[in-house]
Amino acid sequence: MVKFKALYKGMNDDLKDAEMMIDYACEISKHEEDKALADEIAKYAQYRLEHFMTFHKLFENEASKEKNVDKETVSGCMWHETHEMFQHWYDDIERKIKKYS
């Protein structure tokens, strides 16, 4: 289960950092002289959001290899809950980044 833990932690860190960076970019962009810096920070937020999807696909692939992955199994339940939580979080960050742009 180490592989699931590693992928989960990576996805969690990607979303946490993406959200933090876009929030910083929004705050920094309020100062016209810092707009270029804010733009770079926003690009980094976008990169972390994109990287989340890379790990998400890897997680999906690994979960699909597990026998009897469904809501009745521990791994199936974990997958369902994790996927739903991350999807909502991802959507919120994506909206922030689009609003920034």
Give the positions of each predicted feature.
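Non-heme di-metal
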Residues: 1-101
